[in-house]
Amino acid sequence: DGDFGAITFGLMNPNYLQHQSERLQQSIINHLAMITTIKGVCSDLPEFYHNAINLVDTTDINYMGVSLGGNRGPSMLSLIPAIDRGVLWVGGSSFSLQVERSTQYTQFEELFASPLAYESTLDRSILISLMQSMWDTTEAETYLPFIDGGMDGELHPYEILYIISMNDAQVTTLSADRASRTSGIPVLSNSTYHPYGLDVTEAPVSGSAIVYFDGEFPAVPSGNIQGPMEYHSLAHNQVLGYDPAVDLA
């Protein structure tokens, strides 16, 4: 569908990553169109009725995002007025902070660091930071400061619950810390980890919050590097099937 090609060429020439950025912007439009359509004409179709009961509940629409969906949740919730509550699994903010710390980056680094692209680690780090401006239109960091009051009727207020897994090798826990501080949401008192600078609140809570689960998975590197691939699906994926986390969501 063009995404892989856009990223491949972008690793050799970051100007091409604009195409990937545009696809992220299009995804918000696609979600808006989907929600509007399902709430509207689709919900009235005979196929969505059973025993004269409409099977589509259009009164309460919420968002649940996992991984990239967790990263992009704040932009969706802020820009689409039909949804104002979301659960964001293993997400965070600042894609340029996440990239080099992610095992997902491993598959791209071989080309990015090749003689066809940028052999210098320093050059690659600088370019990733510069690329952030291309991602800002759908970046959580752009929308999290307006979580409570919105902005001028263009950005809408919303509530979120971040569910984070310690030692996540795909989406670094550091980016969840950053997202929570940017938004000013509290951390639940029974969370296994309390990020610096956050208010601590007791559950149940009315409004937004963040909670961290610790499955005692292997520690990821503390530096600006990704962990080994055998860590790839541990903390990131297994929290999704952990009953207390699912119940909380």
Which residue stretches match the model-derived regions?
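General structural feature for long, well-ordered alpha-helical segments within catalytic domains
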Residues: 30, 69-72, 175
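A signal for specific C-terminal beta-sheet/loop modules enriched in small/flexible residues
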Residues: 13-15, 53, 60, 106
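Amphipathic repeat-derived elements
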Residues: 1, 60-68, 141-149
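Cap/lid segment of the alpha/beta-hydrolase catalytic domain
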Residues: 1-41, 46-48
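Generic hydrophobic alpha-helical scaffold/packing signal
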Residues: 28, 32-35, 39, 61-62, ...
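Primarily recognizes the serine-hydrolase "nucleophile elbow" in alpha/beta-hydrolase
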Residues: 37, 43-100
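C-terminal subdomain of alpha/beta-hydrolase-fold enzymes, centered on the catalytic histidine
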Residues: 15, 19-26, 82-249
